[in-house]
Amino acid sequence: MKVTKAELAHVAVKAEQYPKNQLPELALAGRSNVGKSSFINKMLNRKGLARTSGQPGKTQTLNFYEINERLYFVDVPGYGYAKVSKTERAAWGKMIETYLSEREELKAVLQLVDIRHRPSEDDQLMYNWMKHYGIPVILVATKADKIPKGKWQKQLTAIAKTLDKEASDPLLFFSSATGLGKDEAWRTILNHLKVTE
């Protein structure tokens, strides 16, 4: 998809702060430092729109990125990072759970996992939780440029097996460094939203 307009339109910690224009939303979930901000920047052709950080756990709000005035990417705080207090983690958890389980505009979750490693227990819990709530999932294996091409399929198979992936859930590989998988990711997203480019 050709992105002509992209902006961070809303930052929210509670439902009253969510967008009101009823555009379809795709949430991005994943462990801290899996590359969500880099994924957003590459997909939207905007280098510094989503701020990347060497500090895991940097995103502490729901960040709504409006794209072409047609849909939103919603960056969700990364999970599985220990260097925040239990109280903060509980607050994030509640905020994320409320958004994911109650938001009508949410059409799917892009769950990002690192292609180099088997999904963690947190990844598995997140995937199972979304399945429990009937939320469609598009799995994106990031950092594909970090391993040889010959190992991609083996790693994707391991990811699918570890998560006990449902056959209907797409599993894509992606590299924010090279743009690999970007067109396929957009095709999958638009197909899922049943909208044309």
Swiss-Prot record:
Entry-linked SUPFAM superfamilies = P-loop containing nucleoside triphosphate hydrolases
Provide the residue positions that the database annotates as binding GTP. 30-37, 57-61, 75-78, 142-145, 174-176
Q: Which Pfam families match?
A: MMR_HSR1 (PF01926)
Cofactor(s) listed: Mg(2+)
A single Gene Ontology CC term: cytosol
Identify the residues that bind Mg(2+).
Answer: S37, T59
Where do the EngB-type G domain residues begin and end? 22-195
Keywords, sorted A to Z: Cell cycle, Cell division, GTP-binding, Magnesium, Metal-binding, Nucleotide-binding, Septation
GO molecular function terms noted in the UniProt entry = GTP binding; metal ion binding
- What InterPro entries does UniProt report for this protein, alphabetically? G_ENGB_dom (IPR030393), GTP-bd (IPR006073), GTP-bd_ribosome_bio_YsxC (IPR019987), P-loop_NTPase (IPR027417)
Q: Does the keyword Magnesium apply?
A: yes
Listed GO biological process terms: division septum assembly
The family assignment reads:
Belongs to the TRAFAC class TrmE-Era-EngA-EngB-Septin-like GTPase superfamily. EngB GTPase family.
What is the role of this chain? Necessary for normal cell division and for the maintenance of normal septation.
Name of this protein = Probable GTP-binding protein EngB
Organism field: Shouchella clausii (strain KSM-K16) (Alkalihalobacillus clausii)
Tell me what gene encodes this.
engB
